[in-house]
Amino acid sequence: MMDSRATYVPPKKISESNSNAEEDPTDCSKPITLKVPTVSETVLATIPHKPQRHLTVYLEGCVGVGKTTMFKYVVDNMFVHTAYDEPMDHWTKWFPENILQTIHEAVNLPTQEQHAYVFSCQNLIATSFLARESGIVKTHPAPFDPSVDVISIADRHALAAYVAFPIHHFLQGRFTYMELQCMLWAFKQDSVDTIFLLQGCSEETLRRVKRRNRKVEHGVTIEYINSLQAAYTVILSTWYRATEYQYSAKRTVSEEISFFIAGPRRTLFYILYDKRPITLPEIEILKLFRKISNDLKKLVLIPVNFQRLVYSSALRRLQDLLIVTPGVTSYIHNENVDTATCAVADNPHFNHHDVS
């Protein structure tokens, strides 16, 4: 291989009084060796250094939709800095009772007792996410660059406990209006997160729930699955509307509210306004609407349907979306399911105008 080092020889000094001047005695010094950069070194030097980012990815969706299986597959087949499980020990071991079992059994209680148990348990479930999130350091999200970036993946986002399941309980008549409001006010989104919202066929989702045979889920029915799927549809359509909101001091309270409740009726804004107590002032409704909007605008929701894909294809799809999406957050849940799916159309491009 040719040596990339060159020898530098200093020029001879010329005497002004004699054109045939002799060499300067200082010319006897040792040659100076210079390093000539190789082509690869020159190219690397011209490329600006890109600092490594650490992105936390959340997977979210209905129980049984395939979150945990996907979660485990991602962890086993992709470099993951940290994998954050659901805070299951909080729910099943550390509290005085198994609150997952209690909240499922509460459906058989009289209405007043049912409301008290469900609301209490849902708050315990939600606060457990705060304990888990306290150890996660997040940076401002950016498109994922697999050559330099690393990701962590988390099973569920706090959005599930503070928003999705409370909406589900409200739709099922197990939450009062003000109990739903309390959970929505308690939700606080500080960082910019992106959530993969896993969707799927309700019948296939229920089949997977029955297949894994968890004791606390024996009471799960197709109505339960449909209600929870509807809650996530409400969140998605609400998020679309929230991203369009811009505050204006020129608009009146009524004009502001009119903006939020316009469009598809299947938004949280419309539900909260339509079901509001007659004694609740409109300004209180508007304050909550603005709060919900500000929280949801910090999320990037990516609706996907992986039920019809084998896991290797689903992983490639997930990686592609990470690269092109500005920020990542996703949900995943522990479940043992195979790749059998319902024969339903896969529509990754969710159209919020179709929400009825």
UniProtKB/Swiss-Prot annotation:
Which of UniProt's keywords are assigned here?
A: ATP-binding, DNA synthesis, Early protein, Kinase, Nucleotide-binding, Transferase
Recorded GO MF terms = ATP binding; thymidine kinase activity
Tell me yes or no: is ATP-binding among this UniProt entry's keywords.
yes
Instruction: Quote the protein name from its UniProt record.
Output: Thymidine kinase
Q: Where is the active site?
A: E86
Q: Where does ATP bind?
A: G61, C62, V63, G64, V65, G66, K67, T68, R208
Instruction: Tell me the enzyme class.
Output: transferase
SUPFAM superfamilies for the chain = P-loop containing nucleoside triphosphate hydrolases (SSF52540)
According to the record, the signal peptide region is none
Q: Tell me, how does this one assemble?
A: Homodimer.
Q: What task does this protein carry out?
A: Catalyzes the transfer of the gamma-phospho group of ATP to thymidine to generate dTMP in the salvage pathway of pyrimidine synthesis. The dTMP serves as a substrate for DNA polymerase during viral DNA replication. Allows the virus to be reactivated and to grow in non-proliferative cells lacking a high concentration of phosphorylated nucleic acid precursors.
Reactions that this protein is recorded to catalyse: thymidine + ATP = dTMP + ADP + H(+)
Q: GO terms for biological process? A: DNA biosynthetic process; TMP biosynthetic process
Regions that span the bilayer: none
| Family classification | Belongs to the herpesviridae thymidine kinase family.
Q: Which organism is it from?
A: Elephantid herpesvirus 1 (isolate Asian elephant/Berlin/Kiba/1998)
- Residue positions annotated to bind substrate are Q122, R214
Q: A Pfam family in this protein?
A: Herpes_TK
Q: Where is this region: Disordered?
A: 1-29
- The record's EC number reads 2.7.1.21
Q: Does the keyword Kinase apply?
A: yes
